[in-house]
Amino acid sequence: MVIGADTFWPDVNGAARFTERLAAGLVQRGHDVHVVAPNQAYRSVKPRIEVIEGEAMTLHRLPSVRWAPHDWLRFIWPWRSKHYARKVLDEVRPDVVHIQSHIIIGRGLSRIAHQRGIPVIATNHVMAENILDHTTMPKFIDDIMLHLAWADAKRTFDLTRAVTTPTRRAADFLERTVDVEGVIPISCGIDRTQYTPVVAPREKNRIVFVGRLTAEKQVDVILRAMTKLDPALDVSFDIVGGGDQRKMLEGLTHQLGLQDRVTFHGRISDAELRGLLSRASLFVIASVAELQSIATMEAMASALPIVAADAVALPHLVHDGQNGYLFEPGNVAELAARLTDVLTADPAEYERMQRASLDGVAVHDINRTLDTFEALYRGEALPD
C-alpha cells in the first residue's frame, strides 16, 4: 500500500505522528508499506528503507522547499505532484492508496490512483485556517484562499472510497464545511502501554503543554493565566515543542516576569516526554484548531487531568468536571480558575480525575484504529 503525507518524520506534529504510527502498525501486521513524503531538501533521492517507530518501511522522499514564514513546513511544487504520483504508482503498483492530506502529495496521488482504478482512502488532519496562519497575506486574500482550498478538498474527497477524520466533531465540521457526506470518525489512537501513569498526588505543581508553538495553539493565553495563579501554589510550566512563535513566547515570558517558572524544552525524545508527563500535575491546551490532539491523549494515558479550550474536538476528549475542565477559548481568567481547581483539588478528587483520564483514553487504542483502517482498505464492514 501507499501512504501519502505532506508531513512526516522528522516533523513533529499530530498529523506526522499519526502517519508514522499508522505506517508502523501496518508493517507489524505484515503489510508492504510505502510512504510518500517531502524530502528535507530540494533533492531527488531513490526510495530507501527507513526505520520509523521501530519498523522498517520504504520511503519515497520527494524534492521539497521550505515555506519561508514557517520554521519547518516543507512542500513539493504542486504542479509536480501528479508526475511524482505516476512515478510512485508505476513502481509500487499498490492495492490501495491512503492519503493523509488533500493539499499537495495526497492531491496528486488521489487523482492518478482514481484514473487507474486504485481505491483511495482519505484522512483529513487539516484545518485550512491553520495553514493561513503562515501566509503573511492580507485577510481578504486569506479568505479567498480558504474558500478555494476547501473547494479543492471536495474535489479530492469525491475521488475516494472513504473519507475519515479523527473525531465525530471533526467529521461534522468537515461535512458542513466541504459538503461531503458519510465522513467516518476514526481515532488516531495511541499505544497506551508506552506511557507510565502515576496515580498519586504530586509533590510539586507542574503544568505541561506539548505541541507546535504556532498561533492557533494560543500558548500566550496559558502564559497570561500563569500570572493570575496564587503565588503560594508555586506553579511551574513546561512547554515542549518548537515553532515559529517560540521567540515571541519567550519574549512574553520575560515581559510577564515568568522566566523563573517557565521552561521551553524544545523538541525532546519520546522517553524524555514520557518522563515529563509522568511528573506533571496536569496537561493544559488552549488550542482552537484541534481535530483530535494526540498530545492530549498521551497526557490522558499518563493519568493527567486535562484543562482544555472548549473548541473543535477537545471536548471529545475532555469531559468538564470529570477528567478535567474546559474553558472558554482565549479567556485568561477562566483558564486560571480551572487550573486552580485542579491544582487545589484534594487527593481523592485529584485521583478521580486521573482515573477518568485513563478510562477516557482506553477507547482510543491503536489496535482498534488499525482494525478499522484495514477494513476500509479491503472494502469490508467496519468493526463495531
Enumerate the language-model features and the residues they cover.
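Aromatic "clamp/platform" in nucleotide-sugar-dependent glycosyltransferases that forms part
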Residues: 288
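N-terminal subdomain of nucleotide-sugar transferases
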Residues: 1-61, 368
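Carbohydrate-associated surface elements
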Residues: 39, 169, 189
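Conserved acidic donor-binding segment of nucleotide-sugar-dependent glycosyltransferases
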Residues: 320-321, 325-332, 341-347
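Short hydrophobic beta-strand element within catalytic cores of glycosyltransferases
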Residues: 305-308
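Conserved donor-binding/catalytic core segment of Leloir-type glycosyltransferases
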Residues: 199-226, 238
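Short alpha-helical donor nucleotide-sugar binding micro-motif in glycosyltransferases
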Residues: 89, 157, 267-268, 275-280
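Nucleotide-activated donor-binding/catalytic signature segment of Leloir-type glycosyltransferases, i.e.
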Residues: 250-268
